[in-house]
Amino acid sequence: MLKLTKALFCAAAVSMAGLAQAADPIVIKFAHVVADNTPKGQGALMFQKMVAADPQLKDKVKVEVFPNSSLFGDGKEMEALLLGDVQMLAPSLAKFEHYTKQIQIFDLPFLFDDLASVDRFQQGPQGKALLTSMEDKGIRGLAYWHNGLKQLSANKKVILPKDARGLKFRVQASSVLEEQFKAVRANPRKMSFAEVYQGLQTGTVNGTENTWSNYESQKVNEVQPFFTETNHGLIDYMVITNARFWNGLPEDVRGKLQQIIDEVTVEVNKQAEALNQTARQKIIDAKTSQIDPLTAEQREEWRKAMRPVWDKFSDQIGADLIKAAEASNKAS
């Protein structure tokens, strides 16, 4: 009798533990490397808030946001995602060349005229196909988030391609971006985002490329006296998740999370340009740096100098994909 009672007690304990475990919310750790007041930072917080407020998800899913490389840095976050240590990231599109060469298209200099052109390509069939192109590597793309168009900064005035010659520019870990600077006889240096300020301050690098919001949020204007408004390239992000984690979610939860991501994406992309313009004005108001816009003729010189990079990566990316991206500039 005692043995039976003990067995029943153990069974009940296991059952109660199972119920408690079933009631535990699904935790989504969303890590990123930038500040909260950037387009990506705002998007992550918006996603967290909307999940917490959703009647269907609020007791089932908990989102935790880790900004400013506070959980994993630039070089470690992708590995952490694949190991399941984080569930969501939004890396720069420059970070995916090891998983699919086609995504290098977003790093090609002077490919897109403006963010409207980027939108047309990303929301078209070719852009959407890229989101699911890495599932066999364990990565599922959920959306594209804008940051914005890139500008140059340096410790000297850089107006024409010849002015960049010999300067050391920080780049993300991207073969295309390395070749972009080599095309103007500058020296690219790979460096994580968190190291950029110190690298510029100490002279490890002389300049960099980024968006206004990233420049201002990291106070790069304190260590860079000159900015050149080139709009030469794109910094966008892909919101990604671990494919096994995503496919293992209950179907109703997965569908609702995707719906919220889609809603957040609309807002992030709507706000990105406004955030960049506000950041640009803050840099002007700080009176620490000079911003030089380019004339059409000067910009064309940069375009011609960097255009050979397209040919170098055409086979890897796909000539048809590049043509589709170019066509987005002409769409009405």
Which residues does each PLM region occupy?
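N-terminal signal peptide c-region/cleavage motif recognized by signal peptidases
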Residues: 17-19
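N-terminal secretory/targeting leader peptides
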Residues: 2, 23-117, 126-128, 132-332
